[in-house]
Amino acid sequence: MARKHTFPSLKRAEILECIDGLGIPFTAKELDQPTSKAVIPLYEEFLDLFMGLTRQNLEEKVNSLQDSVENFEIIHESLRFTVFYQILSQFMQNICFHDFTIQDLLKPDRNRLQLILSAVINFAKLREERLQQFDDDIQKRESLLETYTLLDAQRKDLEEKVLLSQDRKLESEAIIKQNEERNEEMFQSLIEDKRLCSQVRTEYDRIRMEASELKIRYHNVDSLMASTLEEIEKLQSSIVHSPEKLKGKIADTSLRIQNDRSQQVELDKKSKILHTKLNSLQLIEGDLNACLKVLEECLVELDKLEHATVLLSTNQELCDQIEINKKKLEFRKEQLLKQLSNAQEKLEHEQHSRNQKLEAAKQRMDNIREEYKVITQERNKKIQETEKKNAMIEMTEQKIAGMREELESQISSITMEFEKLKSHVELYIAELLRNLRSSNS
């Protein structure tokens, strides 16, 4: 027994026109002589158009079964066909075509294909008519998705900045630690150099004092030698003729000369020592200048250290601010996700309510069709009776006239009843649409 469907069957020309309007390539020959190779791509286009399931999405669903299925490469095509059939069957159930079978894919029949395409086209028309009722929800959903995408991109950007700041912070801390260690070493070296400088200055002052004393003594010796030479010249003028006295004076003079010579040798030695110490002092003075230059470099490094410390503090504040912004963005993201979830739940609830009301309306239409069928059968019976009475018109003309009037009155009452039922149905559908609009708003 053929299953009854709630949608009207469309004509061949109308089906081809609607499919062409959807932008799907499908010829009249493929509709009249359908094959599996022709209908499977057509159904794939329907899934892509109405469910957003592309061939790539289908491959991803099949590939997700790779870990749970043995010999995946061998049965890949069979798995793909099975998954495709399951999704397509679910789609057919949703558009009220409940007797879709695998034969419709493998060995499609012309009449069933025409019926299936009628179901899809009627669903597309109904979807297009009802789509305006959900425009606000769709726009809100798209707006929320765009906001979520933007916030997610900002969150990733901030995370990258935080990671970069943390890396810079670690590098700055390592550089600061190295600078602190180097500054500590240089500070200790400066303290030692300062101590050595003070010792060298003390030694230098002592040597200068000794040099000045030696210069004074040297001048004294020179003056003494000059006076001695003068005395010798005086003595030469007054030569002593007594040998004993002469020998005594000679001995005294020799002794004085030897003493002067020894003093001169000592003075020469001290002068050489002083020259050596002066050279050492000059070298020490060069070392002191180098130490002063190192000290200036240390001061520059200390300034750099202070600048790096200020920069580190600024980066730390920036990192803290970024963390605060990150937490705010995460909180905002959770709020948006909750709003999106609530909107989706509301949309699903509205769709479920709409489906229930549509099912009720379809059931009512089925009942009306059954009643109309019964009325039509009764009308056919009356017509048959009328034909029999027309055959006997010569015998019972008056009786036939009366029955004809009675039949016409019954037909008019039936027509009026049908019109009433039709007006009730239209009123019910209008009330249903108004309730749907009020529930959506």
From Swiss-Prot:
| Ranges in a coiled coil | 51-80, 128-186, 316-426
**Where is it chiefly localized?**
nucleus
User: Where's it found, cell-wise?
Assistant: Nucleus; Chromosome, Centromere, Kinetochore; Cytoplasm, Cytoskeleton, Microtubule organizing center, Spindle pole body
Q: Which residues carry this modification: Phosphoserine?
A: S143, S242
Which GO cellular component terms, listed alphabetically, does the Swiss-Prot or TrEMBL entry include?
chromosome, centromeric region; condensed chromosome, centromeric region; cytoplasm; kinetochore; meiotic spindle pole body; Ndc80 complex; nucleus
**GO molecular-function term, one example from the UniProt record:** kinetochore adaptor activity
Give GO BP annotations, semicolon-separated. attachment of mitotic spindle microtubules to kinetochore; attachment of spindle microtubules to kinetochore; cell division; chromosome segregation; initial meiotic spindle pole body separation; initial mitotic spindle pole body separation; kinetochore organization; meiotic centromere clustering
Alphabetical UniProt keywords: Cell cycle, Cell division, Centromere, Chromosome, Coiled coil, Cytoplasm, Cytoskeleton, Kinetochore, Meiosis, Mitosis, Nucleus, Phosphoprotein
Gene3D superfamilies assigned to the protein according to its UniProt record, in alphabetical order: Ncd80 complex, Nuf2 subunit
**Keyword Cell division on this protein?**
yes
Q: What does this protein do?
A: Acts as a component of the NMS (Ndc80-MIND-Spc7) super complex which has a role in kinetochore function during late meiotic prophase and throughout the mitotic cell cycle. Acts as a component of the essential kinetochore-associated NDC80 complex, which is required for chromosome segregation and spindle checkpoint activity.
Q: Return the similarity comment.
A: Belongs to the NUF2 family.
Assembly and oligomerization: Component of the NDC80 complex, which consists of ndc80, nuf2, spc24 and spc25. Can self-associate. Component of the NMS super complex which consists of mis12, mis13, mis14, ndc80, nnf1, nuf2, sos7, spc7, spc24 and spc25.
Q: What is this protein called?
A: Kinetochore protein nuf2
